[in-house]
Regions:
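Conserved functional hotspot residues or short segments at active or partner-binding sites
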Residues: 28
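EAL-family c-di-GMP phosphodiesterase catalytic domain
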Residues: 14-23, 35-141
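Single conserved hydrophobic/aromatic residue that forms the stacking wall/gate
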Residues: 1-13
Length: 141
């Protein structure tokens, strides 16, 4: 089926452990990149996400799981980890996105730690497309 890269592809990559042939999988991801798709690693920091992804998968975006953001203000180890990941991502040309931002304090800390982008309820709850367009795109019209 034809899918335009601008429309996204959803969750192509869920769990490295579910992939039987890593080489074939990596080649498939490279082919998607040739067609203009961006490859994202979602929920990094939980489940099967590991640092080995940086050496085995050529991806564009690393999305930090909200569990790392939730305790950011009180947890120095979480701040050190995110700051270190920001450096690694920057050096590798990977965009770092923090999920689950709910407070201005979290936002300020993530800016200081050099996180590229943030998302979360601080800005908006998930919206149906029509509601999003009505709320955010009217100013562009």
């Amino acid at each position: 089926r034809d899918v335009a890269p601008s429309r996204g592809l959803g969750d192509v990559y869920k769990r490295q452990a579910e992939v039987d042939n890593q080489l074939v999988f990596s080649q498939a991801l490279e082919k998607l990149k040739e067609y203009g798709f961006s490859i994202s690693i979602d929920d990094f920091g939980v489940r099967n996400a590991s640092l080995s992804l940086f050496t085995t998968i050529n991806f564009d975006i690393l999305k930090l799981d909200r569990s790392l953001v939730k305790t950011l203000a009180q947890n120095q180890k979480a701040r050190i980890l995110i700051r270190s990941l920001a450096v690694i991502c920057s050096d590798l040309g990977i965009k770092l996105i923090a999920e689950g931002v709910e407070t201005l304090e979290q936002l300020d800390i993530l800016k200081e730690l050099r996180c590229n982008e943030v998302q979360g309820y601080l800005f908006s709850k998930p919206l149906p497309l029509n509601d999003f367009e009505n709320k955010y795109l009217q100013i562009l019209r």
